């Protein structure tokens, strides 16, 4: 039995080194990944499986032809298509996990404005899994299902194997207003101090300037006495990720047109 927060991680499905076992691990990890995130694209699958794009294209075509995946064309992301689950895939997952599953994502329910953002979140987690840094994760959709409420949700929550702690993942795709940033800081403080949902917040983006902007504005807000925010608390609990490799990866796969 695979823990629900580990579903989608390919290594959790590999029962032997046989060709069939490796194929099944790819298939079921992908189905669980899509179930948890709602949809995905070829660029995310490349990272998740750690294979070449040609392999991904060949495999997803087979899954589409087999009636497992629904391929949806879109101009809202660089890959120009995303993949959803078909009823057959849900039945396969229900049989695998021995439980009833509900999946209500349809092409009409996907917000085009958030597709790239959501794919980048998946990219960050897949990259962390590939690097051996993430043990398990909780998606934003799952936080919503767990009745944590809109004001407490982040893009994802992960278990950081290196630091042995829960961390929140936040992806910045644009500059935010000062009131919005102030609200976010208060939400982070509550989630960390009162609710014990995670210990740190990690800020990622496809461009260094958005990470820098978040750091600059947050520093200004936390240092202002009238906001009643502990500057040292946020310096300890918010980390701004300037990893050049990851920023370039995100930009080239999800943003560059």
Where are these regions (language model features)?
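Non-catalytic C-terminal interaction segments of nucleic acid-processing enzymes
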Residues: 2-3, 11-17, 21-33, 39-42, ...
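Active-site metal-binding core of divalent-cation-utilizing nuclease and nuclease-like domains
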Residues: 72, 112-115, 125-167, 175-177
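Short, basic/hydrophobic alpha-helical segments
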Residues: 186-195
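A short, highly charged nucleic-acid-interacting micro-segment common to nuclease
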Residues: 105-121
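Structural motif
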Residues: 141-142, 171-173, 204-208
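Nuclease-adjacent, charged terminal/linker segments that flank catalytic cores
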Residues: 1-103, 107-108
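Active-site-adjacent loop/helix micro-motif of nuclease/hydrolase catalytic cores
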Residues: 175-186
């Amino acid at each position: 039995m695979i823990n629900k927060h580990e579903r989608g991680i390919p290594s959790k499905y590999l029962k032997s080194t046989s060709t069939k076992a490796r194929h099944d691990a790819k298939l079921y990890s992908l189905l669980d990944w899509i179930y948890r995130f709602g949809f995905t694209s070829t660029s995310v699958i490349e990272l998740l499986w750690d294979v070449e794009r040609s392999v991904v294209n060949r495999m997803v075509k087979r899954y589409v032809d087999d009636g497992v995946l629904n391929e949806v064309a879109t101009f809202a992301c660089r890959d120009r298509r995303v993949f959803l689950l078909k009823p057959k895939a849900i039945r396969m997952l229900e049989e695998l996990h021995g439980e009833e599953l509900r999946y209500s994502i349809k092409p009409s329910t996907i917000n085009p404005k958030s597709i790239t953002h959501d794919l980048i979140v998946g990219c960050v987690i897949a990259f962390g899994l590939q690097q051996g840094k993430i043990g398990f994760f909780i998606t934003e959709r799952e936080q919503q299902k767990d009745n944590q409420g809109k004001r407490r949700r982040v893009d994802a929550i992960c278990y950081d194997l290196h630091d042995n702690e829960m961390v929140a993942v936040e992806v910045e795709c644009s500059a935010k207003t000062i009131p919005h940033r102030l609200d976010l800081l208060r939400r982070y403080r509550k989630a960390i101090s009162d609710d014990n949902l995670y210990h740190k917040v990690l800020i990622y983006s496809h461009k260094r300037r958005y990470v820098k902007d978040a750091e600059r504005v947050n520093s200004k807000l936390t240092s202002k006495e009238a906001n009643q925010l502990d500057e040292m608390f946020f310096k300890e609990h918010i980390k701004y990720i300037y990893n050049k490799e990851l920023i370039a990866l995100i930009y080239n796969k999800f943003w560059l047109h």
